[in-house]
Amino acid sequence: MADDGLLLNFSLGDSNVIKAEPKLKGGTWRDRLSARKIAQHRSKGPRKPGDENTAPRVPRNPNQIEVSATRPQKRQRTDGGDGGRPQSHAQSNQPRQFISSLFTKNPEPKNVEEVKEEGPVEEAKPTNAPLIDGLDTFTNLGLSPSLAAHLLTKLELKAPTAIQKASISQLLKEDGDAFIQAETGSGKTLAYLLPLVQRIMTLSKPTTDATGQPIVHRDSGLFAIVLAPTRELCKQISVVLESLLRCAHWIVAGTVIGGEKKKSEKARLRKGLNILVATPGRLADHLENTKVLDVSNVRWLVLDEGDRLMELGFEEEIQGIVKKLDARQRPSRIPGIPTKRTTVLCSATMKMNVQKLGEISLKDAVHIKADPEDEDEKARLANKEEDSAYRVPAQLKQSYAVVAAKLRLVTLTAYLKRTFMRKGSVMKTIVFVSCADSVDFHFEVFTRKKQQTDDADASDEEKTEEKPLSPHGTIAPATAFSNPSNPVTLYRLHGSLPQNVRTSTLASFAKNREPSVLICTDVASRGLDLPNVDLVVEYDPAFSAEDHLHRIGRTARVGRDGRALVFLMPGCEENYVEILKRGYRDGGKALTRVDANDILKRGFGGNVEAGKKDWDVKATDWQCEVERWSLENPQYLEMARRAFQSHIRAYATHIAAERSMFNIKELHLGHLAKAFALRDRPSKINVPGLRQGKEETKKDFKAERRPAAGQKRKADGADMGDSKSSSSHDTATSAQKMRAKMKEHMAGASEFNLA
């Protein structure tokens, strides 16, 4: 086709001009990616004002707020704000706080059982009460008339319990070893102390012709040693022993326990003792280093709470004590003293470790039980697959409540408010938690001063009356669940407190005749006979079934009535109910379930039948008030974080047989943090010893690898700018470590389960 001379000119415009993309070379791939994005952004060019009219119109959403394309002019604030001051962006680096609702997204209980209404219940016959038969008196068991009269007149004990009847007659009749097994609260302490005192009183009956004084006195030597696992139990045994020895003043008893000065203990040993109550560790120390401690005349050795002795790791100490007693035993010149030593082992359970302790200390021991004639019971226990069998007192009314993690704190508060609503209904309550840090946190929450409605109107005198944060303040008014007609005193107790503070706190709680609550760890769960304890609350379930038995054994003692409540969370913890049922002779028919919402309604809403709907609002307001109180006080916020951390670490220490019921992987840490008045994400709760979240660990690792802006990197990978401040950084780090170490020694709440 021939060229006709026509020339075509097409106008494409500036927007459709094809531009060559530059090829980027060199640098890292991050730098090339950033440069490519910048080039693409520049190639688009500025947006023309008329382009918005040519864009397709999107149908309007009635719920969408239209925003103008042109930015309106700012107006000056007239509400007393900062005006034109530029806003600081420092808050963007702070951890975001999320205030979740108490009653949303809570897991539902898996096992839905019918909640039994409270009504007239058939009274169960007490299984640990003194015998009613008039023939079973202390005199008929072989005790001297003076000791029996002392029990009747001074101690007001008219008849022995079943275990006391069986053990006193056996230990007075024979000199062989014995294993005493009885349920908690049945009087095991007197079961071995009465034969011990009676045998030593029998040795002192012959008198010399010259002076007329008993042959046995404090210089005659040490005849008996009683070992107990905890200092509190040693103190209690010593108090009971001193009350018995008031009828035999020439017999002297003493204690050697940890936490006291060894110099004072050596002075007591130098003066002379006939009966010694001790902890295994301190006794082993004295046997090794104290020459004045003469054990050649020791003829009675008692191991109280044998299962706890083994759990606390005293096996080596006890084995060494037994070997030293055997090696140092010598024939005595005192007439009537046994030729060989008698060892008595006491325990409420028959576990494998108790049997191992018996192999170490006992030889041909007699098994003493409260009901040896019950052959059906013995046969049934022999066919059980478990290595231990524990029994709950029949008169103890036990219940459990399935409470969501977020509702734990408010539910406990509501239950205590309802318990102490009327004066005289409940005198004393013990609340068991898993760790010492949790004890300190809940003590501060329940004893905090209520916030003023108007801080400006509060006088200076009212501000000075606020309770200071004291590391050893263990007694305070319980403002969270007290009322004007029934004030309640709150106590706290755990193993990290100094020994003198623990002793004084426990004595004050025992002597207090007004309504009081003791919040504690398992340090108060073994052997302590605290009078008038009507209720036991297991806020955190025990680490084993045996520990649960000893916890609830603080109530319903020696025939008295008692109640116990266990808090469980929805999910795998509900299977723990089967463990609770095993402790009953009737298969758990007496075990009842309490609805968590009913507890909240009764605690925060008053009468349930009134149909009030504001109980959930009151519970939410109380929870938010505690959270604000925690945020406004850095020392309490740090305490809450430590309690949260220690609780999680303690949660993982359940025994292997029950670990499937307390699976730490199924814990909702965010919901659990709500129970400690925390609004932070669990990964943001940075306290010493708590592992950071995965994202924060990656960020810190990358930040350490990258040099700061304007700094050069050395050949060894360190930043040049770091060398200038290395000395100051090391000084600050060492000072911080020193403060943390001092705080650990002063506060003493670093452990999560001390007994």
UniProtKB/Swiss-Prot annotation:
UniProtKB keywords? ATP-binding, Helicase, Hydrolase, Nucleotide-binding, Nucleus, Ribosome biogenesis, RNA-binding, rRNA processing
Motif DEAD box covers 304-307
Basic residues bias: start-end ranges: 38-47
Query: Where does the sequence pass through the membrane?
Result: none
Top class in the EC scheme: hydrolase
* InterPro entries on file: DEAD/DEAH_box_helicase_dom, Helicase_ATP-bd, Helicase_C-like, P-loop_NTPase, SPB4-like_CTE
Query: What cellular-component terms does GO give this entry?
Result: nucleolus
| One GO BP annotation of this record | endonucleolytic cleavage in ITS1 upstream of 5.8S rRNA from tricistronic rRNA transcript (SSU-rRNA, 5.8S rRNA, LSU-rRNA)
Task: Please state the Enzyme Commission number of this protein.
Answer: 3.6.4.13
Positions of region (Disordered):
28-128, 452-481, 685-755
- Residue sites binding ATP per the record: 182-189
Q: Amino-acid biosynthesis as a keyword? A: no
Question: Where's the motif Q motif?
Answer: 136-165
Q: Which GO terms describe its molecular function?
A: ATP binding; ATP hydrolysis activity; RNA binding; RNA helicase activity
Per UniProt, the ranges with Low complexity bias are: 718-735
Q: Which SUPFAM superfamilies match?
A: P-loop containing nucleoside triphosphate hydrolases (SSF52540)
Report biased composition (Basic and acidic residues) as residue ranges.
Answer: 107-125, 692-717
All copies of domain Helicase C-terminal, residue ranges: 395-600
- Which residue ranges have biased composition labelled Acidic residues? 454-463
The entry sums up its family as follows:
Belongs to the DEAD box helicase family. DDX31/DBP7 subfamily.
User: Other notes on this protein?
Assistant: Present with 1460 molecules/cell in log phase SD medium.
Functional summary from the UniProt entry: ATP-binding RNA helicase involved in the biogenesis of 60S ribosomal subunits and is required for the normal formation of 25S and 5.8S rRNAs.
Name of protein = ATP-dependent RNA helicase dbp7
Q: Which organism is it from?
A: Aspergillus clavatus (strain ATCC 1007 / CBS 513.65 / DSM 816 / NCTC 3887 / NRRL 1 / QM 1276 / 107)
